[in-house]
Amino acid sequence: MHPDHHIIRAHKVSSCCNAGLLRPASRRIQRTQKAQGAKTKMSTASHYVCDLNGMDWQVAQDFEANFRWEYDDGRESLLKLYRKGKRQQWDSDTRIDWSQDLDPENPAGMPDEMIAIYGSPVWNRLDEKGRTRIRHHVQAWQISQFLHGEQGALVCTAKIVQQVPGIDAKFYAATQVMDEARHVEAFSRLLHEKYELVYPINPYLKSLIEDTLRDSRWDMTYLGMQVLIEGVALAAFGLIRDYARNPLSKSVTAYVMQDEARHVAFGRLALRDYYPQLTDKERDEREEFVVEGCYLLRDRFLADEVWECLGLPVAECKEWVDHSELMRVYRTSLFSRIVPTIRDIGLWGPRIRKAYADMGILGFAEGDVEGMGLRDEVVARELDVRLAEIKSTAEQAAATA
């Protein structure tokens, strides 16, 4: 392999895809831009693995915007979270070192065991080049879903600002809108500049976002986005943060998680106060939504579109994924944050418990959500310290060379 082959990309062929290495000319341009401190300009459309039916998606909504004329009225728990959100704003251009490259053999440096078809006959038949393509595409697919989900969170949180009746919740939701914009920016840049490959939104994730946005009740936006989508995203981010060997991948997810832990706490605080006021019928409707949403999120991680894009036998891959013990453990672990949150906000009727038992995730009910959120903050701060030490050491070495 040529020593300059340190960045990977995919070349689109018709409606499918074919992963290769970044051309030398493109590498020289990118290095010049890095030296000048400029971002690479590119169109997302040119990086999608398949043609889309347009670059826009409109979701019709019918809801009322709430104004409140009492401005000195707020729950201390939410106001405290709001102040924390203001203090912890950050700039992805300066906090993240974008000069770092990805490994062409394994961009994020993730264990192969986390690939859904690892150990399958399909995987075992592949040569190293084929496995490299799968690593690239699976990771790009996952980050693409993070990206689309973060845009969903951006839109949903803007809706919460309008809908939620309390001024304290409006204050915090406004800080989250900024957070989500930053997350979209960071994941978009990671895909554009480093992977140069983007997958469309998974249909299951798209369906849940659409259901969340179409519902006119303000609490359903919280429930669908703050609790379900952000909850499973936190668990997925955590796997990359904790297992990735690439420092760029680790830092992006660690810093996003620091914000997301606050977002889930926001949903918990708002809904925990509101749900005791619901009638049995209203609570049943929420529980049905949660059950359906959790099944959609579970099925989101099948990644059928990746196997199809790469020309692999989709039916054989699906059969393996459906019966893989490794994938069962992986998929259930993604609900480690959702289950205790659902219990905490008071949606813990027989329907929820049965569904969670059937999915094999009921055991997460005793999880310490607050403790997990605190750990997310600690990990992000520790990463800042380590990266600062590495940068200082490198600068000292350069000065004495």
What role is predicted for each listed range?
Residues 189-261, 285-296:
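Active-site-proximal alpha-helical scaffolds that flank and shape metal-associated catalytic sites
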Residues 3-5:
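Alpha-helix boundary/capping motif
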Residues 156-160, 174-175, 234-240, 252-255, ...:
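A structural feature that tracks compact, well-ordered secondary-structure segments
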Residues 16-17, 21, 27-29, 37-158, ...:
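Terminal targeting/low-complexity segments that flank the catalytic cores of oxidoreductases
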Residues 252, 264-274, 291:
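Helix-loop elements that line ligand-binding/catalytic pockets
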Residues 166-196:
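Carboxylate/His-rich catalytic cores and anion/metal-binding grooves
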Residues 144-147, 151, 174-177, 181, ...:
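Short amphipathic alpha-helical segments with heptad-repeat character
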Residues 149-156, 183, 229-236, 263:
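Amphipathic, well-ordered alpha-helical segments in soluble domains
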